[in-house]
Amino acid sequence: MSQIPFTVSARTAKLIGQENFSNAEGAIIELVKNTYDADSQYCFILFENIGTLNATIYIIDFGCGMNDTTIQNCWMTIGTDDKLFNIKSDNGRIKTGAKGIGRFALNRLGNYTTMYTVPEKSDIGYKWTVDWSYFDKPGITVSDLSLIHI
């Protein structure tokens, strides 16, 4: 018999967020922990139009940002082991995340996510967008999703 690789449905990735982050408060805490891991001195959480269809949550930090390699190897890798081997931040903080699934907390907060990141000492930034409803489409696998824009 030939070797058959695993295929992961996009729906599974969405379920990771729903099972690990039971409510919006837990999801926000997870994202604030990410700002800590990025050595941000400050984290601002702004709520806009809460209770309406245009509700928006902004989580703004001043951390180290991500370059394209970090986005590909860490942010876009489900279950990354990066924090197992890089347990301290550049400023010596013990990193709080360990499972490599924190980005799925975003799914708990709304149907659409946009993330902007600018790596330290760089003039080039990245924009990451996702429509979480796309993860529910039948037959879509994780490898079908390409979500990063430069």
Question: Model-flagged regions — what are they?
Answer:
Residues 1-148:
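GHKL (Bergerat-fold) ATPase N-terminal catalytic module, capturing the glycine-rich phosphate-binding loop
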